């Protein structure tokens, strides 16, 4: 299947540069999979759109200030490092720039010398494995010297005092290099209103890394390889999902990361989501048969991206691209700080 089938024209002005305030004032396109019908709402209307008994599943991951800047030791070369995955023993898988100058054995001094990164090896995905050298607590140090890893299409840095705007209000466990952006639209009040209406909410964990945002650089979808990301389904979530499925209630994934987590877990246990953790490199594109989710809340995604392919697998490529065209005509805002879709 050609990657070009998932391309579309996107004017630069449609890319949201700042988030809407309040969070739940963003727009919400509702797409009905069976008929292709589209409705235009506000995100806080979700409380009136979902049914009592629906189960919302959110991703409780928390973004770390994973973007670090420094100098290649004994030179004036500026280096950017983005933390991806901890590997133990102070080693991390990272992205680096400029890559060609950072070979094994090279040191990079970060945070005015408070942290040193030793390049250990080059990875299959063009990143690096580094070993960090430092004093004190690593997480505290990263919080002090790191920056939020906003996507490159967001051209204005988020002030440190506004860093929470790139976190979901229910984020708990540190580990992501990007936000699970579908969840950015929820407020504490909206979550409370949903619960009062009889809509159940549970959480799983997927630490967002290269697998979620790595561009597709091949011509055929089948040739793209996903990067592994850590996921976890705890017993409470597994029980809630199993009960909903047994009772014929809808399971609605808040974001593609939740969809990939639940479909991974279901694939390991003959269609049943069981408690457990591990690494997933699941790549969902048209032709995939969903085993768990009945609905999906998601943002509007980049052309030719694996996220757009996942959404197309769930709702149909032509139907999704038609909805995207309508969204552009009606002035919806795209990507991480943009508006949302509910696909049911």
Swiss-Prot record:
It is an enzyme of class 2 (transferase). Its main location: cytoplasm. One of its GO terms (cellular component) is cytoplasm. It catalyses: 7-aminomethyl-7-carbaguanosine(34) in tRNA + S-adenosyl-L-methionine = epoxyqueuosine(34) in tRNA + adenine + L-methionine + 2 H(+). It comes from the Bacteria. It is found in: Cytoplasm. GO terms for molecular function: S-adenosylmethionine:tRNA ribosyltransferase-isomerase activity. Signal peptide: none annotated. One of its GO terms (biological process) is tRNA wobble guanine modification. Pathway: tRNA modification; tRNA-queuosine biosynthesis. Its EC number is 2.4.99.17. Keywords: Cytoplasm, Queuosine biosynthesis, S-adenosyl-L-methionine, Transferase. Belongs to the QueA family. Transfers and isomerizes the ribose moiety from AdoMet to the 7-aminomethyl group of 7-deazaguanine (preQ1-tRNA) to give epoxyqueuosine (oQ-tRNA). Monomer. This is S-adenosylmethionine:tRNA ribosyltransferase-isomerase. It comes from Heliobacterium modesticaldum (strain ATCC 51547 / Ice1).
């Amino acid at each position: 299947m050609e990657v070009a089938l998932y391309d579309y024209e996107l004017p630069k002005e449609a890319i949201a540069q700042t988030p809407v305030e309040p969070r739940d004032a963003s727009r919400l396109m509702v797409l009905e999979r069976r008929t292709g019908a589209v409705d235009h709402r506000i995100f806080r209307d979700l409380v009136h759109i979902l049914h009592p008994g629906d189960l919302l599943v959110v991703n409780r991951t928390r973004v770390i200030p994973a973007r670090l800047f420094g100098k290649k030791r004994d030179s004036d070369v500026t280096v950017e490092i983005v933390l991806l995955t901890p590997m133990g023993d102070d080693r991390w898988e990272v992205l680096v720039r400029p890559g060609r100058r950072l070979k094994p054995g090279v040191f990079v001094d970060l945070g005015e010398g408070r942290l040193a990164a030793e390049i250990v090896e080059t990875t299959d995905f063009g990143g690096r494995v580094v070993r960090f050298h430092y004093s004190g607590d690593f997480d505290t140090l990263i919080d002090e010297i790191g920056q939020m890893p906003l996507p490159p299409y967001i051209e204005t840095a988020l002030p440190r005092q506004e860093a929470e705007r790139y976190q979901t209000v229910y984020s708990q466990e540190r580990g992501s290099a990007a936000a699970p952006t579908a969840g950015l639209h929820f407020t504490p009040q909206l979550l409370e209103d949903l619960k009062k209406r009889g809509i159940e909410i549970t959480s799983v964990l997927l630490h967002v890394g290269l697998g979620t945002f790595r561009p597709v650089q091949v011509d055929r979808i089948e040739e793209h390889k996903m990067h592994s990301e850590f996921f976890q389904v705890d017993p409470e979530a597994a029980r809630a999902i199993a009960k909903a499925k047994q009772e014929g209630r809808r399971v609605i994934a808040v974001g593609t990361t939740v969809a990939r987590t639940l479909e991974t877990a279901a694939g390991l246990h003959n269609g049943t989501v069981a408690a457990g953790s591990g690494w997933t490199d699941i790549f969902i594109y048209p032709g995939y048969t969903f085993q768990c989710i009945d609905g999906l809340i998601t943002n509007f995604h980049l052309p030719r991206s694996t996220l757009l392919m996942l959404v197309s697998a769930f709702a149909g490529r032509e139907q999704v691209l038609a909805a995207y065209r309508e969204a552009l005509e009606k002035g919806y805002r795209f990507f991480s700080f943009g508006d949302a879709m509910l696909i049911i």
